Design a protein with these regions (language model features):
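Alpha-helical transmembrane segments
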Residues: 7-19, 45-49, 81-90
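Membrane-helix interface linkers and caps
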Residues: 22, 26-82, 95-112, 145, ...
Length: 281
């Protein structure tokens, strides 16, 4: 078997299995800590990225396409895109949801915008380690390595999106506090997970293409940080409320179908631009 394909399979298996291994370790050791602060959670969070690092160092992949460099100042516009794309997509979706009468923003009036900024800041800082390990697994390793073996761009992003969502399953079902999860979604948990596989594909197109066109993993790390910080307080802290059958589609959080479609459109445009540039190189 080609070593590049072998290494991709290894990281993929670790990605899908590490969370369940973490749960097993917690059960084996009789863990009494909150699940998200346990040894099992550490195994779940770090294994995909660490397996990629090890394969780059010792498995023959090398570091050339790892995206560790910032690619600044020449790549400044990709960092600007990372900062703006989700707030703009969320704002547009927010307006449509309000127009359809399914969204209330009374929480902003009651709590104040300062409270929202404070919550967003806490989440931004609290997400740093998680998003480092996520992005240095998916976009630092899987996306460029799939491209290196000749996988077409859309299939590349579909594969990464499916693995990305599958990695989250133990998080949703075990590590994350159930009440906290329910406060941040607009559907039942099974429906939320089914929709996650749908919305993660166009989201993966945006993340993957931004990573490839910027030649840096730090752009998508920043994008992930912004999405978590801006999105999570909206429902979880009660700043907005989205109700009705259209809620999963038009929630302005990153779990919303419409937001993910906007992500996919931007990602598609980046892909077309990138491939055009490659064709002219």
């Amino acid at each position: 078997m080609n070593k590049n394909i072998r290494n991709i399979i290894i990281v993929s298996l670790f990605t899908v299995g590490c969370g369940w291994l973490g749960i097993w370790l917690n059960n084996l050791t009789g863990n009494t800590a909150p699940p998200l602060q346990s040894l099992g959670a550490l195994v779940w969070l770090t294994t995909p990225a660490l397996s990629g690092f090890l394969l780059r160092a010792f498995g023959g992949d090398g570091w050339k396409d790892s995206g560790f460099g910032l690619n600044l100042p020449s790549g400044w516009m990709w960092y600007l895109l990372a900062l703006l794309v989700y707030p703009l997509a969320s704002l547009l979706t927010f307006g449509l949801a309000a127009l359809f009468g399914i969204l209330s923003a009374d929480g902003f009036a009651v709590q104040g915008f300062g409270a929202y900024l404070s919550a967003a800041g806490v989440i931004f800082v609290g997400s740093l380690m998680k998003n480092f390990f996520e992005e240095f697994a998916w976009r630092s390793y899987l996306t460029p390595r799939l491209e290196a073996v000749g996988v077409k761009p859309i299939l590349n992003h579909v594969i990464v999106g499916i693995l990305w969502t599958s990695w989250h399953l133990p998080y949703y079902y075990y590590f994350l506090d159930r009440a906290l999860l329910e406060s941040a979604i607009t559907t039942s948990i099974p429906v939320f997970i089914a929709l996650a596989y749908v919305v993660q594909i166009p989201t993966s197109i945006l993340f993957g293409e931004l990573r490839l066109i910027s030649k840096s993993t730090w752009t998508v790390f920043l994008l992930h940080q912004v999405i978590n910080a801006v999105s999570m307080p909206l429902l979880m802290n009660g700043f907005i409320e989205v109700k009705g059958a259209l809620a999963p589609i038009f929630t302005p959080t990153n779990e919303g179908v419409f937001v993910s479609l906007l992500f996919g459109v931007v990602g598609w445009m980046l892909m077309k631009y990138r491939l055009k540039q490659v064709g002219h190189a």
